[in-house]
């Protein structure tokens, strides 16, 4: 079996984090969603760590015995495989007057739930799994719904929201993306 970064399930914490930390992480996600839904892309970009890895692997349909091959391995083709520099380019494109894929802009609603926080061995670093639902309305009749799981590595940071995103893996539930484009951020 090919080993992929998703071969290992999210490691549940031995004990829950404090209610205060859980609340802080959830509030961070709610504010992040609001930034994206209100097209505050520069403010959202400021939440990304310099060493960010923003990855959405391609998912394939496999039989029960081939579930370990469901996702493409790291380094293979992916919907997104971005660094800080490529995310900056996507933000610049999205906010320019020449962004044909997003003119007029999409209207989005990011919903985040089922947030599970685990403190990592490195102080100030958290591993977080969450469920998401992203609704996008575009033009007059185009509607897209994306559902899945995000696996993030957050670092405590000196910014207004208290954290920065060091890694985001987006695991779509659907294997075939029916949307005209993927010009949204998850």
From Swiss-Prot:
Keywords: Aromatic hydrocarbons catabolism, Dioxygenase, NAD, Oxidoreductase. One of its GO terms (biological process) is 3-phenylpropionate catabolic process. The keyword Cell cycle does not apply. It catalyses: biphenyl + NADH + O2 + H(+) = (2R,3S)-3-phenylcyclohexa-3,5-diene-1,2-diol + NAD(+). GO terms for molecular function: biphenyl 2,3-dioxygenase activity. Gene3D superfamilies: 3.10.450.50. Pathway: Xenobiotic degradation; biphenyl degradation; 2-hydroxy-2,4-pentadienoate and benzoate from biphenyl: step 1/4. NCBIfam families: PRK10069.1 (NF007479). Heterohexamer consisting of 3 BphA subunits and 3 BphE subunits. A ferredoxin (BphF) and a ferredoxin reductase (BphG) must be present to obtain activity. Belongs to the bacterial ring-hydroxylating dioxygenase beta subunit family. This is Biphenyl dioxygenase subunit beta. It comes from Comamonas testosteroni.
């Amino acid at each position: 079996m090919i080993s992929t970064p998703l071969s290992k399930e999210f490691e549940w914490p031995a004990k829950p984090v404090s209610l205060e930390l859980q609340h802080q992480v959830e509030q961070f996600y709610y504010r992040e969603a609001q930034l994206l839904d209100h097209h505050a892309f520069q403010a959202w970009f400021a939440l990304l760590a310099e060493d960010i890895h923003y990855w959405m692997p391609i998912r394939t349909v496999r039989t029960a015995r081939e579930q370990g091959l469901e996702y493409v391995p790291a380094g293979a083709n992916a919907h997104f495989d971005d660094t800080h520099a490529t995310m900056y380019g996507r933000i610049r494109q999205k906010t320019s007057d020449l962004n044909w894929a997003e003119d007029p802009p999409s209207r989005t609603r990011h919903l985040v739930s089922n947030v599970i926080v685990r403190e990592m061995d490195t102080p100030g670093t958290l591993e977080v799994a969450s469920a998401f639902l992203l609704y996008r309305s575009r033009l007059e009749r185009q509607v897209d719904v994306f559902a899945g799981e995000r696996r993030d590595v957050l670092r405590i940071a000196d910014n207004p929201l208290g954290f920065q995103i060091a890694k985001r893996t987006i695991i779509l539930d659907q294997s075939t993306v029916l949307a005209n484009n993927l010009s949204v951020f998850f």
